[in-house]
Amino acid sequence: MLSQRLIGRTAVKSAFRPSGLPTVVNASRWRRGYATEADRDLVIIGGGVAGYVAAIKAGQEGMKVTCIEKRGTLGGTCLNVGCIPSKSLLNNSHLYHTILHDTKHRGIEVGDVKLNLGQLMKAKEQSVSGLTKGIEFLFKKNGVEYLKGTGSFEDPHTVKVELNDGGETRVTGKNILIATGSEVTPFPGLEIDEKTIISSTGALSLDHVPKKFLVIGGGIIGLEMASVWSRLGSEVTVVEYLDQIGGPGMDTEISKNIQKILKKQGINFKTGTKVLNGEKTGDGVKINVEAAKGGKPETLEADVVLVAIGRRPYTKGLGLEKIGIELDERGRVIIDQEYRTKIPHIRCVGDATFGPMLAHKAEEEAVAVVEYIKKGYGHVNYGCIPAVMYTFPEVAWVGQSEQDLKKAGIPYRVGTFPFSANSRAKTNLDTEGFVKMLADPETDRLLGIHIIGPNAGEMIAEGTLALEYGASSEDIARTCHAHPTLAEAFKEAAMATYSKAIHF
């Protein structure tokens, strides 16, 4: 039976997957300065996506759980200063830009349109607040103890918690889970003040629209924030060290296409360009750059500079060295395929360890690690972790890119279908982009799926499911898709992969 096969399946061994979880003892928030009497089954340090999902799952499994979070609100970077607030700004800035530039030819004429940046930010904060309160409700529903404070190891079974409202307590556990997430990677010589030199956190809460907005780093975070502020009226320039935007995981053909589209929207790009240094001026910042391969230096000026060169694991102050937990050269907690550190009852998941720093990857690991602790088995397929960039159009992919397959010497065939030939996209007047599929030329098994176009982030779910179950392009092509829908482009791309598309 399928269920039996899934239960027997172990976590995929990949470049990023260690394992393991410990049982934890918890301390009461009211017994400050004293150890608690009762051990917890699981103590979790960190209340971000990995931490809170693990806490809820453990509670559902009947475990006694304590979750420690220093921010004062649950949800971590994703919910408070990442995925969620950025999507609010992306959605509402796109709506504003559409009203300004794209309604007249649709037959909608509007009067004077004004931006109320304060209300835009308020709407973002309301979304965040509602979701964080929702997690607290789920904690109560599932019997999870929530300590607001900073946790650090006192010994392999004891976590000291410095409580946010004063005092300290100690929590002991049979299992301990490190889920402390990540932090912004700083750029040497550029001190972030969240006013003129900002991180992604500052980019989500500016109190004005900068005249000139410069982004260092053309990855997903940089491009999403570039889109927001460009739509709101900034003159935006993106400086990227690599020759393509979107990061190394994005398919090269997709990257070239989204760069052309974003350039048409008014965003300027300097790819293959190295930032040398920078300095604050009276009312802005000067950034010195040159070609990555060497060349004549150039000075760029901006009112605000966003540093978006990536993130790094956050393990500072945990006291890992005190108990002998090892980190690799990039600061990631070293784990095995069951998420265990060298101390078997202490495990780590999410951004603090190996793999892509994605909230949904952390969520999958959180469920798996609790299953390993409680049942002895768990599963995450690291070959089926989708990625989405929420620009307009959106970009989404899962599986291998064309450059991945070429580098590995794996044969493949390609099928594509443009949204310009899709009836729903044409009625929506949003026809930029295409669906691209890569499949094994002999077995027809899908190897990778890449989408640039409207609602790509929603459509990639079908691709992820297809890869998870080992589907062929013909499997997709012979599956009925409703008409007229954007998803028909997915079906047509599959038809083009194993045979020929009908509508192109």
Curated annotation (Swiss-Prot):
Catalytic activity reported: N(6)-[(R)-dihydrolipoyl]-L-lysyl-[protein] + NAD(+) = N(6)-[(R)-lipoyl]-L-lysyl-[protein] + NADH + H(+)
Disulphides: 78-83
Class in the EC hierarchy, top level: oxidoreductase
Amino-acid positions noted as binding FAD in the UniProt annotation, renumbered to this chain: 69-78, 87, 151, 180-182, 351, 357-360
One GO cellular component term noted in the UniProt record for this chain: mitochondrion
Binding of NAD(+), residues: 217-224, 240, 275, 310
Pfam family, one: Pyr_redox_2
GO molecular function: dihydrolipoyl dehydrogenase (NADH) activity; flavin adenine dinucleotide binding
Cofactor annotation remark: Binds 1 FAD per subunit.
Source organism, top-level taxon: Eukaryota
Record site feature (Important for interaction with PDHX and activity of multienzyme pyruvate dehydrogenase complex), residues: 444, 469
Protein localization: Mitochondrion
Family: Belongs to the class-I pyridine nucleotide-disulfide oxidoreductase family.
NCBIfam families referenced in this protein's UniProt entry, alphabetically: lipoamide_DH
Protein purpose: Lipoamide dehydrogenase is a component of the alpha-ketoacid dehydrogenase complexes. This includes the pyruvate dehydrogenase complex, which catalyzes the overall conversion of pyruvate to acetyl-CoA and CO(2). Also acts as a component of the glycine cleavage system (glycine decarboxylase complex), which catalyzes the degradation of glycine.
Subunit relationships: Eukaryotic pyruvate dehydrogenase (PDH) complexes are organized as a core consisting of the oligomeric dihydrolipoamide acetyl-transferase (E2), around which are arranged multiple copies of pyruvate dehydrogenase (E1), dihydrolipoamide dehydrogenase (E3) and protein X (E3BP) bound by non-covalent bonds. The Chaetomium thermophilum PDH complex contains 60 E2 units, 12 E3BP units, about 20 E1 units, and 12 or more E3 units. The units are organized in 1 E2 60-mer, 4 E3BP trimers, about 20 E1 tetramers, and a maximum of 12 E3 dimers.
Protein name: Dihydrolipoamide dehydrogenase
Lineage: Eukaryota, Fungi, Dikarya, Ascomycota, Pezizomycotina
